[in-house]
């Protein structure tokens, strides 16, 4: 919690300075800092709630297309500042999940995709692809996998096995952007609590793909 409090103070101070020293400037810079604050506060809140997640669950039908659009809308400032464009494909699927927790997970993954975009690419070349696929039925169940793929800087191979560890920032977090090391940890833990599978593949200089697999029985689909 202390780490979050420290990180929250920085954008608050920056927002105050921008507002005080540049009263005639557009509000974009202030909005950017406030978006950072909202993201950090959201992480802190979901971390606190994760201890009693069973009491906060509400599993129901979730339209992937709608929840992805909501997550992107709430992260619009992050994408604009990073010059990243979202692309969609085959999201017309309904899954069983808690919409609040799933949207939080998506927002964290989308923030990371924008934060670690490739600085050598022009704004129109920085892309995040969001897509989904449904598996063939097997032993009474089927699964839907949601993919968040980017063409960013990628994750060093030696960091891949630790990116879901609590507090791990890795080389990218230290070099390119300030990181609490809690976003991906929370995503992984919340996925486990909802019986979802979160995986990642990445190559430095090429980008990363995060996958969320949601299993469903035939009775869930009826």
Which functions belong to the PLM regions below?
Residues 125-141:
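Short beta-strand/loop element within the Bergerat-fold HATPase_c
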Residues 113-117:
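Short helix-loop "hinge" at the ATP-lid/N-box region of the Bergerat-fold HATPase_c
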Residues 206-210:
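Glycine-rich GHKL/ HATPase_c ATP-binding element in histidine kinases
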Residues 155-167:
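Short conserved segment of the HATPase_c
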Residues 150:
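Acidic ATP/Mg2+-coordinating residue in the GHKL
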């Amino acid at each position: 919690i202390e780490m979050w409090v420290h990180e929250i103070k920085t954008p608050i101070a920056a927002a105050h300075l921008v507002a005080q020293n540049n009263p005639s400037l557009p509000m974009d810079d202030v909005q950017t800092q406030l978006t950072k604050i909202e993201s950090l506060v959201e992480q802190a809140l979901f971390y606190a709630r994760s201890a009693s997640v069973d009491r906060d669950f509400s599993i129901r039908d979730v339209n992937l297309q709608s929840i992805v659009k909501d997550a992107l809308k709430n992260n619009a400032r992050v994408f604009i500042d990073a010059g990243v464009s979202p692309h969609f494909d085959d999201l017309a699927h309904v899954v069983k999940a808690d919409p609040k927790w799933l949207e939080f997970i998506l927002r964290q993954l989308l923030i990371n995709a924008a934060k670690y975009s490739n600085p050598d690419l022009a704004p129109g070349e920085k892309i995040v692809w969001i897509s989904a696929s449904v598996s063939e039925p097997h032993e009474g169940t089927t699964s839907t996998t949601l993919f968040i793929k980017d063409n960013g800087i990628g994750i060093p191979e030696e960091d891949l096995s630790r990116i879901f560890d609590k507090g791990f920032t890795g080389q990218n977090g230290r070099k390119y952007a300030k990181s609490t090391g809690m976003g991906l940890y929370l995503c992984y833990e919340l996925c486990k609590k909802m019986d979802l599978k979160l995986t990642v593949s990445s190559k430095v200089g090429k980008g990363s793909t995060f996958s969320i697999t949601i299993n469903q029985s035939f009775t869930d689909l009826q």
